[in-house]
């Protein structure tokens, strides 16, 4: 009877643990699309982020794309997770695409398919030093956009609203 009770307790613990593990690191929830706040039960950092968001061009035309890179400033500044969008004011614009074989990132729908990109579930040993994606503006867009991100270093250490320099949309 004691063996049965121990076995039941072990199964209950396994189920509870797997649910907790399953709820983490699967990418940004859709509820984060507008305010970009992860559901980590922690407050965003107010210190300058140890990450940069850069592009391979200062302008892009509809029909073309630009590479966007999120990178740590130092080797120890790895990314455990992120949510990246192109914004003009509060509008989330354009479409992202991933490099072939990218096992870290996934496209999500923040109002339109592929207009945001986030991380996939992964082991902490697979945190990244940098992430590379491509972004294409929609037809008819003019003005400038910035790339805005939430970047997660650990579950409780993350920055919201990290921004790139603006890029110009040209026709």
Curated annotation (Swiss-Prot):
May have antimicrobial activity. GO terms for cellular component: extracellular region; membrane. Residues 24-171 form the Reelin domain. Residues 1-23 form the signal peptide. It holds the Pfam family Reeler. GO terms for biological process: defense response to bacterium; defense response to protozoan; innate immune response. It comes from Bombyx mori (Silk moth). Belongs to the insect defense protein family. This is Putative defense protein. Gene3D superfamilies: Reeler domain. Glycans are attached at residue 41. It is found in: Secreted. PROSITE patterns: REELIN (PS51019). InterPro entries: Ferric-chelate_Red/DefProt, Reeler_dom, Reeler_sf. Disulfide bonds join 33-110. Its main location: secreted. Keywords: Antibiotic, Antimicrobial, Disulfide bond, Glycoprotein, Immunity, Innate immunity, Secreted, Signal.
């Amino acid at each position: 009877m004691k063996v049965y009770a121990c076995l039941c307790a072990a199964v209950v613990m396994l189920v509870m643990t797997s649910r907790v593990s399953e709820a983490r690191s699967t990418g940004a929830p859709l509820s984060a699309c507008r305010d970009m706040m992860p559901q980590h039960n922690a407050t965003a950092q107010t210190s300058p982020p140890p990450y940069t968001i850069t592009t391979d061009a200062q302008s892009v035309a509809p029909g073309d794309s630009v590479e966007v890179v999120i990178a740590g400033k130092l080797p120890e500044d790895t990314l455990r997770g992120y949510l990246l969008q192109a914004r003009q004011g509060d509008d989330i614009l354009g479409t992202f695409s991933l490099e072939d074989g990218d096992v870290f990132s996934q496209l999500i729908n923040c109002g339109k398919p592929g207009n945001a990109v986030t991380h996939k579930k992964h082991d902490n040993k697979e945190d990244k030093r940098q992430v590379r994606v491509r972004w294409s503006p929609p037809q008819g867009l003019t003005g400038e956009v910035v790339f805005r991100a939430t970047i997660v270093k650990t579950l409780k250490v993350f920055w919201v609203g990290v921004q790139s320099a603006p890029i110009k949309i040209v026709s």
